[in-house]
Amino acid sequence: MYMNRIKTLILFALCTVMAIACENGHNNELPKKPEDKSCFVGSMNVDQNDGTMFTLNDVQVDYELHDDNTLNFVMYNVKFASAMPLKLDMVVEGVTYSVDGNKYTLSGDGIVPYAMGGPFEKFTITSLEGSITDEQMALSFMCGEYPVTYSGTK
């Protein structure tokens, strides 16, 4: 009886540690599934650095503003090369923004993206520039060594 309680306690502690390990910032507060009306839908282009370009259409991107003039965005169900075996949701946190009328101007450098529950340091986001209006979103950044652009509309 005593051993069963110890095993249960250890199992509970292990589950708690695993749950805490999966917490990695604001990205857990973003919508798990995009809502069609709130997401931008567009094309993402990734320069493969071998003279070819990989294009993925119908990419959904959503964002969340924070009070400290940063935002997070999520690119849903994306892959960055035709040989990539699966699609993933990529979260980019801590993008700086400024506001001019109804336009947000974005910038960021040295941002580690999250995907599949963990950080992807190899694909650190650098030279991020972009803009968001009520109807359009445009992004340009380096994802590791790969130049990426995105253009979407609502």
Regions of interest found by a model, annotated:
Residues V78-E129:
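Contiguous, well-ordered beta-strand patches that form the walls/edges
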Residues I10-A19:
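Bacterial N-terminal signal peptides
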Residues L65-T70, T96-Y104, T133-D134:
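A short, structured loop/turn motif at beta-sheet edges
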Residues F54-E93:
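N-terminal glycine/threonine-rich, aromatic-flanked beta-hairpin/loop signature
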Residues G42-M53, K79-L86, P113-E121, F141, ...:
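Flexible, membrane-facing loop/turn or short amphipathic-helix motifs
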Residues D58-L65, V92-Y97, I125-S131, Y150-G152:
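Hydrophobic/aromatic beta-strand elements that line small-molecule binding cavities or substrate pockets
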Residues Y2-R5, M18-S43, M142-K154:
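Bacterial Sec-dependent N-terminal signal peptides
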Residues L128-P147:
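Short, exposed beta-strand-loop hairpins at the edges of beta-sheets
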